[in-house]
UniProtKB/Swiss-Prot annotation:
Glycosylation sites recorded in the entry for this protein: 338
Native source organism of the sequence: Australian bat lyssavirus (isolate Bat/AUS/1996) (ABLV)
Protein name: Glycoprotein
Keywords noted in UniProt: Glycoprotein, Lipoprotein, Membrane, Palmitate, Signal, Transmembrane, Transmembrane helix, Viral envelope protein, Virion
Transmembrane stretches, start-end: 460-480
Gene name in the database record: G
Amino acid sequence: MLLQVILLVSLTAILPCTGQFPLYAIPDKLGPWSPIDIHHLSCPNNLIVEDEGCTSLSGFSYMELKVGFITTIKVSGFTCTGVVTESETYTNFFGYVTTTFKRKHFRPTPESCRKAYNWKIAGDPRYEESLHNPYPDYHWLRTVTTTKESLLIISPSVVDMDPYDKSLHSRMFPKGSCSGASIPSVFCSTNHDYTLWMPEDSNSGMSCDIFTMSKGKKASKGGKVCGFVDERGLYKSLKGACKLKLCGISGLRLLDGSWVSIQNHEEVKWCSPNQLVNIHDFNADEIEHLIVEELIKEREECLDALESIITTKSVSFRRLSHLRKLVPGFGKAYTIINKTLMEADAHYKSVRTWDEIIPSKGCLKVREKCHPPYNGVFFNGIILGPDGQVLIPEMQSSLLHQHTELLESSVIPLIHPLADPSTIFRGDDEAEGFIEVHLPDIQKQVSGIDLGLSEWERYLIIGISAIILFILAIIFTICCRRCKRRKKIRTDHIELDRKVSVTSQSGKSIPSWESYKSRQGHSRS
């Protein structure tokens, strides 16, 4: 504690009377470089303030956030889309079969989606069988429609959960969020009426796996807890803390933005909506000295950069600048050589003006001489620009805009297809490209006799058929009349033959005129 007070007093003594924070701190002694792992990075303890009189220490266990917590929690899930696959077959007069497949959508139920997902992850053969289109049936001169309802599962589908109110956030949700999900029926509607989102684990629902158990020492004074020493040996004060629930667990949000599950017997107010974890909104009366305020802000930026490095598995020169020592004293320096993260022991000194460390173009003054860069890289985020200028991230000048992150993030988050606006379906057939199919029951519909004609062709054939039938009826009528006429003529001839028979003078009947004449000739002779 004495060394900390001496450090703080000496730091205050070297500052101007205006109370401004030192412009920069740079090593005046720099040890050899050695490679380190990304998980060995740490933020320097620039200021440790212990509460006066809190000398009674006792061991205790507490919960804190896991490393990598960045105010949102990744929840793995899947989407379930209801699809109706329809096969339509038509068999013409000659037996030729034409099959047409169509696809429509319907809104599935959460229970059926969970069952389909369990089939998929368990390797159930019923799921494999459901990947096929419905088997088309056919009947002669008929149209047969066969439909199969499908539950299409896409996994994984990762969304963000807000630990403060446990709401889910993703671009696939209407208005970007889903706040109506509850255990045990956890599901969210998406931008498509026929698609639901559900978490992979139905038992845990939307539980938060962001906490870790740690051991520390509680500092108290007269039975009142005023701070604690965490597992890493850093003392944290409860002064200015407020109550905050994360994932339903009560705890305290400390002044530096960290969260612990420690309970304080003193009456503590609830945090305001703008007081979030790792996001600070300090008031002037909460900070006793401007130096302390600046150190806390710089530490938070360092913690944010460290969290970003660990979660993205990516290091940039800009992020390394946050890990440097801010005040005079011993610390660490970092750089990147041959794409390898390097560390060196260093002793920092205070800098009041930039001219002290950049006396000329391209010269970074360290240990009273120009420090040589390695492929344009110095250390702590300081690089050599294309024009030969030394670029320091903290420099408040036009050169700051020229400083870019030379090492991009190597981790690309998995984005669900529905979360990409470019993949929003324009038609029913566009859902086939990236969807896996689960198909339950099959339904068949057999139509009446169908000649496979369009509506206007059908009416045209009906009209022509009517005309042909009318003509055939006329022809049939004419033929019938002619047949009747011929039959009548035959009947008339027979009656005429009967009427022309005569009787001779002898009283005998003569059947015809010729026989009568012949008989008259014989009688005369």
